[in-house]
């Protein structure tokens, strides 16, 4: 696991964050690049926010967002 790698978590604020043991959660905001685990590998994607009709955060590549997925902050993960 790299120093930027952790697990994806939905925060009380409604934003997704990469959480690492002993570290403050790193919230992922609209426009941020991050890596998410898909089929056992980390893939680079970008977070966006949809205002309607289904309000919420999503990845531009359509990757599912779920608690406890392996994820990494930044472009280089």
Sequence positions of predicted segments:
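Short coil-to-beta transition motif at edge beta-strands of beta-rich domains
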Residues: 24-38
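A short, compositionally biased
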Residues: 11-13, 28-32, 52-54
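A sequence-composition feature that detects small, non-aromatic residues
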Residues: 12, 17, 39, 71-72
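Short coil-to-beta-strand transition motifs
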Residues: 1-3, 37-46
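Short, compact, well-ordered microdomains
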Residues: 41-77
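Mixed-charge, Lys/Arg-rich low-complexity intrinsically disordered regions
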Residues: 1-26
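Short polybasic amphipathic segments
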Residues: 15-20, 34, 55-59
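Assembly/interface hotspot detector across virion components, adhesins/toxins, and nucleic-acid enzymes
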Residues: 6-8, 35, 47-49
């Amino acid at each position: 696991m790299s120093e930027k790698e952790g697990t994806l978590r939905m925060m009380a604020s409604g934003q997704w964050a990469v959480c690492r043991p002993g570290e403050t959660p790193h919230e992922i905001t609209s426009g941020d690049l991050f890596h998410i685990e898909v089929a056992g590998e980390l893939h680079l994607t970008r977070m966006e926010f949809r205002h309607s009709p289904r309000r919420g955060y999503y990845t531009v590549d359509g990757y599912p967002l779920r608690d406890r997925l392996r994820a990494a902050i930044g472009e280089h993960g």
